[in-house]
């Protein structure tokens, strides 16, 4: 089978299902597992080279609608008559359903079901632990200028709760929210989590926040709780969010959650 993946989260789903050997090309940003870096690239996820995709004669193109603008890819796949599957995850349950849907399409239903069972076990364990925590007020920053942050309709609001926190923009019923720094200050986060999409952690600094007007009004700034996180563990709707959750929870509540490590709970044991 010849598979093309058009975004990083889809590539990661294929890896969990053990089908990377069938992948003949990926988008430019797919970088996990590391072996996908050797695969041919078909362009950025919002500007896929469909001529190249078609030339690869795929048996299945795994597309997504997780980011605005991706619908152009889907329309072009339909126009060219290329066999495709479209995933549109916005919640943690959506991600589990995507695993099942992709597993069915690939004849991997048993493996997908086992992955989903373990996935829900991890979520349930964190949910039980987090229930006794005083929720930390979390401000997630996807992009600094203009400011974009996840709203209540995004998986990071759910992930926040499972780590013993609360997304301060969870009251906004959108997946992505454009806002102003003054609004962030008014909500007074106790932790600021920088996950700038597509930006490496080594290129980021807390100074990007502390230099902003009236930054000291935020509890997170006064207490030094500005955290630079790996965006690939938080901004992609794949089971790798569980690795991000394992890192975030002890950061917020070290007495409740075990120290973080890099192990993936779906790939252990």
Describe these PLM feature segments.
Residues 1-269:
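N-terminal ligand-binding lobe of clamshell/alpha-beta domains
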């Amino acid at each position: 089978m010849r598979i093309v993946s058009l975004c990083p989260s889809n590539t990661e789903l294929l890896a969990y299902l053990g089908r990377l050997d069938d992948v003949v090309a990926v988008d430019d940003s797919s970088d996990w597992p590391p072996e996908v870096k050797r695969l041919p690239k078909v362009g950025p996820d919002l500007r896929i080279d469909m001529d190249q995709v078609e030339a690869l004669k795929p048996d299945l193109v795994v597309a997504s609608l997780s980011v605005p603008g991706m619908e152009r890819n889907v329309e072009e796949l339909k126009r060219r008559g290329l066999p495709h599957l479209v995933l549109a995850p916005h919640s943690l349950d959506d991600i589990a359903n995507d695993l099942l849907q992709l597993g069915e399409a690939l004849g991997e239903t048993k493996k997908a079901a086992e992955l989903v069972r373990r996935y829900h076990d991890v979520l349930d364990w964190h949910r039980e632990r987090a229930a006794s925590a005083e929720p930390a007020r979390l401000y997630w920053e996807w992009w600094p200028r203009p400011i974009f942050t996840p709203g209540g309709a995004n998986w990071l609001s759910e992930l926040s709760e499972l780590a013993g926190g609360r997304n301060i923009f969870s009251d906004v019923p959108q997946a992505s929210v454009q806002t102003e720094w003054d609004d962030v200050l008014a909500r007074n986060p106790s932790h600021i989590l920088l996950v700038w999409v597509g930006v490496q952690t080594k290129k980021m600094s807390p100074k990007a926040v502390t230099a902003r007007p009236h930054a000291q009004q935020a509890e997170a700034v006064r207490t030094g709780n500005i955290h630079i996180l790996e965006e690939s563990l938080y901004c992609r709707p794949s089971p790798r969010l569980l690795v991000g959750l394992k890192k975030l929870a002890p950061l917020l509540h070290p007495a409740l959650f075990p120290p973080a490590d890099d192990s993936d709970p779906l790939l252990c044991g």
